[in-house]
Amino acid sequence: MITTVLRRSLLDASKRNLSASLTSINTVLFHNLAPAATRVSDLALIGSSDVKAGFPFGVEAKGIHFQSGPLDFRASMVSQAGFAISESSERRVGDSESVGGDGLAISELGISPEIVKALSSKGIEKLFPIQKAVLEPAMEGRDMIGRARTGTGKTLAFGIPIIDKIIKYNAKHGRGRNPLCLVLAPTRELARQVEKEFRESAPSLDTICLYGGTPIGQQMRQLDYGVDVAVGTPGRVIDLMKRGALNLSEVQFVVLDEADQMLQVGFAEDVEIILEKLPEKRQSMMFSATMPSWIRSLTKKYLNNPLTVDLVGDSDQKLADGITTYSIIADSYGRASIIGPLVTEHAKGGKCIVFTQTKRDADRLSYALARSFKCEALHGDISQSQRERTLAGFRDGHFNILVATDVAARGLDVPNVDLIIHYELPNNTETFVHRTGRTGRAGKKGSAILIYSQDQSRAVKIIEREVGSRFTELPSIAVERGSASMFEGIGSRSGGSFGGGMRDRGSSFGGRSGGGGYGGSSGGYGGGRSGGSSNRYSGDSDRSGFGSFGMRSPEGYGSDRSSQSGGRSSFGGGRSGGSSNNRSSGFGDFGSDRSSQSGGRSSFGGFGSNDGKRSY
């Protein structure tokens, strides 16, 4: 054991010495051999692929640029009318995100030419408002909290300053170190998106994305080789730390992206464990589309006199300015049948994401839509490799409709999404904001349509008020009962899918009848005793249940009393549980003997027998 440790230490030391020697040799070589006309101040090795004319031997000098230039960026370039920045530790810049004219040219910032060139190749020539407001204090090394609406460019806001500093650091100290920057994200999709932004903005940097669902051995080997930027989810980061593969002792920059979601999904303890392992001398930044007050306790503990850059302020509007919101009433049995007309009318051949509450709905709806459209499903039960292929196909335009659960609601930056359809009311306003934020990104236009039932009208008004956006009501689309038969089993015929009254602002958005949904003769997503998406969002129904997956018999997923596997957990509980009630098991029954009654009549076949047996 001791021999192995000593051997690895000697290997790391050899890597560092070799890297430093090569850096020194290259610097001296090019200082002596470069023509006088091209020689300026100290050369910096940054990994650019540019080849400078006049170098001898016809050798392509990878990683050479001649001067990164001073940081020629002044506060006056940001502090414009309506976009002022105060000198206090909390800077409110949220009067208007559109103020600032055409933005600030990236080529005038004095940052590394590599970054300017890389961003220009992506068509990014000017900074968005949050990037303008964040850049100078980030370059100064300030800890900060950045708040902006979804889709306003938060990633580049912290990415540009960090990348520029790492490039300059590498020019002086060489390569072969532990990561200098750590970015934490709540989901693997967001982590991959952030890592992609870093990689494309600075091709010379070594970046890695750390998340579960992929072989950990490959990530360990890449870390052993050496990286500049590590982006990952807290769970995988801690796993690699415990294995000794990830050394955070040299981290100079740490970023928490979508920090509010990080804490809400249960990563609070993991995040604090990671932050405790970081060097005290570092720059810490936190970015999020929303900033609940309770997140302040985290900033007080781990951030040093943080600056707040607030591009939202007290504004009620939580969506980007380019998004138009619509709503439409549809009965549960006909809801799936109107997706096609909505896509045809509002997406106009462009990209569309349809958000469902459950993985089964995503599968079945995508299967049904595939008869008329190019469509794929995306959810947590799909393997990571298939998810990546699906997203790549969607980005590249191989299909134009993506039916997804909330796994795609945060972090996915798919360009030119024209339409978002909420197949059902989301659990809360924040989910609505982040789903809708997949369109109208980076100043583009987009639309979002919310489908709801008649008894959910009050919930729609609450969303309107909390989001700060008035919905335009679309005329109802007539659906013949026969044409909707192919969609039976997706929802039910007995009312709203989110049962329960609006007893508090955080409850589910639904009427008091508790009808509809997935299983149970009177239920939906759970009554007061049955579970649902969580007990907080349960309603008045007593027998519904998207609850625990208890087993009454090997033949079905229904259970009369499956509360032992549910209780207070997110999908648990109640007296009915299961994907159906005690009389409607079978594989994936989405209704009961009194709801969908899809067995034998649905094109999907046999999803609702009356006696706990399969029927095909």
From Swiss-Prot:
Q: GO CC: one term?
A: mitochondrion
- Using the record's annotation, list all stretches that form the Helicase ATP-binding domain: 135-309
Matching PROSITE patterns, A to Z? Answer: HELICASE_ATP_BIND_1, HELICASE_CTER, Q_MOTIF
Q: Which GO terms describe its biological process?
A: Group II intron splicing; response to cold
Main location (coarse class): mitochondrion
- Biased region (Low complexity) positions are 532-568, 578-587
Output the Pfam families linked to this UniProt entry.
DEAD, Helicase_C
Kindly list the positions annotated as binding ATP.
A148, R149, T150, G151, T152, G153, K154, T155
Q: Where in the cell is it found?
A: Mitochondrion
UniProt entry keywords in alphabetical sequence: ATP-binding, Helicase, Hydrolase, Mitochondrion, Nucleotide-binding, RNA-binding, Transit peptide
> Residue limits of the Helicase C-terminal domain?
338-482
CDD domains per UniProt: DEADc, SF2_C_DEAD
Boundaries of the annotated transit peptide in chain numbering: 1-81
Residue runs in coiled coils: none
Q: Where is this motif: Q motif?
A: 104-132
Sequence segments annotated as region (Disordered): 489-616
Q: Please provide, alphabetically and separated by semicolons, the GO molecular function terms listed in this UniProt record.
A: ATP binding; ATP hydrolysis activity; mRNA binding; RNA helicase activity
Which reaction does this enzyme catalyse, per its entry?
ATP + H2O = ADP + phosphate + H(+)
* Family named by the database record: Belongs to the DEAD box helicase family. DDX21/DDX50 subfamily.
Q: What is known of its domains?
A: The Q motif is unique to and characteristic of the DEAD box family of RNA helicases and controls ATP binding and hydrolysis.
Name this protein carries in UniProt: DEAD-box ATP-dependent RNA helicase 53, mitochondrial
Output the lineage of the source organism: Eukaryota, Viridiplantae, Streptophyta, Embryophyta, Tracheophyta
Give the encoding gene's name: RH53
